[in-house]
Each structure stands twice: as C-alpha cells, then as structure tokens.
Amino acid sequence: MPPPLEARDYIGLAASPASSSSSCCASTPVAEVVGAHLALRLGLPGSESPARAEAEAVVVDAALTLGPAPPPRGGAKRGFVDSLDRSEGRRAAATAGDDERGVREEEEEEKGLGEAAAGAPRAAKAQVVGWPPVRSYRKNTLAASATKTKGEDQGKSEVGCCYVKVSMDGAPYLRKVDLKTYSSYEDLSLALEKMFSCFITGRSSSHKTSKRDRLTDGSRADALKDQEYVLTYEDKDADWMLVGDLPWDLFTTSCRKLRIMRGSDAAGMAPRSLEQTGQNK
C-alpha cells in the first residue's frame, strides 16, 4: 500500500515559526510608532509632543522617497550633488577672498598716493590737476618753461629784426624787407630797385641824377616833379613822409610802412627839414 501524500509548500505561503516570529518582532516597533503617531492627544494647535517627533523621524526614515539621497554618514562616498555643492562653496569662498584682497590692495595704493601727494609741493592755481599729481606737476612745469622759452625767442627775434611792408604804385604785389639788414639809405634804395626792377623805368635823359639817388633824392622839393618814383614811409603817427629826413638809426625805429609812389603824386611832400626851413622863413 503506497504511503500517504504529504502537503508540501512549494510557493512558500506557510512560513516557518522562526521566520514568523522574527518578522513579528521586526514589525512590532514600526506598528507601535505608527500607532503612537496616529493617536489622538490633547494640546494646543501646532504643538508637537516628543513622542510624535520621534515617530515622524522613524516614519521618514522607513518611507521611500523620490528626492535626493540624504547626506552620507560615516565614511560613505559622496554623491554627485554633494560634490557640486562643495565645489560651488569653494569657488564662492575663493572669489570672496580675491575681492577682499583686491580691496585691500586698492586701499594701500590710495594711501601711498595720498602720502606722495602730501609730500609733493602744492601746484599753482593755473596748473591743471591730473593723476598722479607728480606727473601733472612736471607736465605743467615743462609747459611753463616751453612758453617762457618761446616768449624769449620771440622777443629776441623782434629785437633782432625790423620787417616792414613795401608797396609800389602800379605793382600788383607787396614785398617785405628787414631794415636791420641795411646800413644806409643807399643800400635800401638799391635793394628796392632790384625788387621792383620790372616796374621802375629809366627817367628822361634830361635829368642826369644817378640811378642810386632816384628813389631817395629829396634834397630839393622841385626835384620831386622830375623823378618818376619817390620812396616814402609811414611813421608812428601814421603820417607819410619822404625817406631821408631822419638819421638812419632813427628811421629804422620809426618806420612802419614803405611806399614807392610816383613823383607827381609826391610833389606836395617834402622832408621835415625843408618843412621846418619853410616855416622859419
């Protein structure tokens, strides 16, 4: 007779007594905590008892969440998010340190420049204040010395030369001569004849005065009518006079303009010596 059939648990529905006892022991604290959390208590709104806080902590630890992993404990490895947070914190700290260092350096530079400015001589009111003040002071000093040198050169040039304009009746242009380069009226007359040689023509053969004396011959008032051109000048008083009435040195200081005019137009003009002689008569 075959042996009786025994019921076998192939799926594992029936747990062993040891496993069931262990599972019951493991689930008992959680059930107790959950029951304590759900229990009704008397208290003010919003207040929490220590037992409820502990229960919430246990429930949170036992629950599964989809958020970021909690920070590592002990010697566990760091997560990706944690490493990023720490790197950003280090960068922020380094940036703050660099900013503080730059501010300190700027303060030290300003302090040093302020001490240099306090030790430097005070600039004049007319000088332009720049930065740094030492360079602007040197620039203003060089500009003042250059202006002074330029003024001295101009003064020397004005003292060393005496330029006057020369015009001629019928000539379409003007010339300018330096009276300091000539030593007498004769030299000036020759130079002007060379300048305006194309406009000055020979006089009539009846007049035998030399070519040199043609522009400056003012010794006789009657001779002006016979001369084709006569040299006149404008003095400081804006009066037109015949050349030759003053000594050469005095003439160079009083002459402002020269004009070679026709003898017929200068018939009413005479040197000052002849005018004074006529008044005395």
UniProtKB/Swiss-Prot annotation:
A motif (EAR-like (transcriptional repression)) lies at residues 40-44. This is Auxin-responsive protein IAA19. Pfam families: AUX_IAA. Belongs to the Aux/IAA family. Keywords: Auxin signaling pathway, Nucleus, Repressor, Transcription, Transcription regulation. Aux/IAA proteins are short-lived transcriptional factors that function as repressors of early auxin response genes at low auxin concentrations. One of its GO terms (cellular component) is nucleus. One of its GO terms (biological process) is auxin-activated signaling pathway. Residues 66-126 are annotated as: Disordered. Residues 79-91 have a biased composition (Basic and acidic residues). Residues 114-126 have a biased composition (Low complexity). Expressed in etiolated seedlings and flowers. It comes from the Eukaryota. Its main location: nucleus. Disulfide bonds: none annotated. Induction: By auxin. Residues 161-265 form the PB1 domain. It is found in: Nucleus. Homodimers and heterodimers.
